[in-house]
């Protein structure tokens, strides 16, 4: 919905006729634009700056109006680099907010914040566009059914199950495996549920975005021969983009997901990697707009910005959006305002632990810190609930005994505590799992473990039936039958060595 600027003389009458303004000031990615009296654009309108820089290169920068300053001026945030812009350049008011393509034609393609394809595979064949700013669905449209979303990952399905149509946070510091877990979830959901996913890469590494794209092509999640058979649309606003693009790219991805939910009536998965970068970009924009910073230097509008994004992610009577959001935790501090504000919106949290990653237990999901509102007997059933609680109790007891073991050694424990420690160590290892997307690193084929199989495995460990097996037999296996088979192989190998 863009209006190309017409060439015009600098006369005021022509400017008024074409709804054109001129750049009055440039502060990095923020532009002040002067418009003729009575021709002021609305907040969130898209403005387009077209022209040539000093070297003759074409410039095409889209901005979004953020503030009306008075004196016929507006302050706008650029969605791409402002290099080459000069004061006095013409700016066109499109009279509409940013709009992006939506629908089946977006599948298998990579877009930027403006909805322009950036994968060099030609234009997107769609005439359907949707504005990125919308209200959340009304109460009457919401669906309140509670059901579990099976992921095929043991530690998640057993201890912190995801809600269909819910919001899930992946918490963890740098380098503990958030992005690998997200890639595995996209892979499992496309294969096991046949669902459509939208991936929003918000302020993360371009290399990771490229790796994810290649991985998806290899695994068949994206079909280059026939895009209609692809299962995912990708929207990237990576680390090298200006803060305006990083702040709005989450809304672009969400708008595409909403169309699949509301018009196609599908169940959609929305991945946001990383929601912290959305907050960080908002903080940068807030400072550039001259707002007073709030706690720890964050923007004063942090809760409002987060709420306007999160409240649109929900289940309606037409379909659902289940959202999985990676949350970078600065300095591993969960009380930082960015992760703390995110917590308020989540139905489940998957917390990744550096301690488990150091032990080599992947996925490094902390079984005691991860939570879910779904883990209730009336939702998951008595058997699942009881097994999950007993697993947590065993691991908690092991955690309490670790100081005693470190000082006095295992031999000083009672018989009962020694048994608890042995079972807890088996459980800890059985919570690890080989991933499909990590096959190249681990050399082990990936495993999808159904919920019933997961519960059966942990019940067998807790019952004591497998006390005789070595704990390494439970490391990086799928279901419990693979663990017993691995134990037999280990025994044969040790006999051969003798």
Swiss-Prot record:
Its main location: plastid. GO terms for molecular function: ATP binding; ATP hydrolysis activity; proton-transporting ATP synthase activity, rotational mechanism. InterPro entries: AAA+_ATPase, ATP-synt_VA_C, ATP_synth_F1_bsu, ATPase_a/bsu_AS, ATPase_alpha/beta_chains, ATPase_F1/V1/A1_a/bsu_N, ATPase_F1/V1/A1_a/bsu_N_sf, ATPase_F1/V1/A1_a/bsu_nucl-bd. It is found in: Plastid, Chloroplast thylakoid membrane. Gene3D superfamilies: 2.40.10.170, Bovine Mitochondrial F1-atpase, Atp Synthase Beta Chain, Chain D, domain 3 (1.10.1140.10), P-loop containing nucleotide triphosphate hydrolases (3.40.50.300). It is a peripheral membrane protein. The keyword Ubl conjugation does not apply. Keywords: ATP synthesis, ATP-binding, CF(1), Chloroplast, Hydrogen ion transport, Ion transport, Membrane, Nucleotide-binding, Plastid, Thylakoid, Translocase, Transport. ATP binds at residues 172-179. Belongs to the ATPase alpha/beta chains family. This is ATP synthase subunit beta, chloroplastic. It comes from Cucumis sativus (Cucumber). The lineage of its organism: Eukaryota, Viridiplantae, Streptophyta, Embryophyta, Tracheophyta.
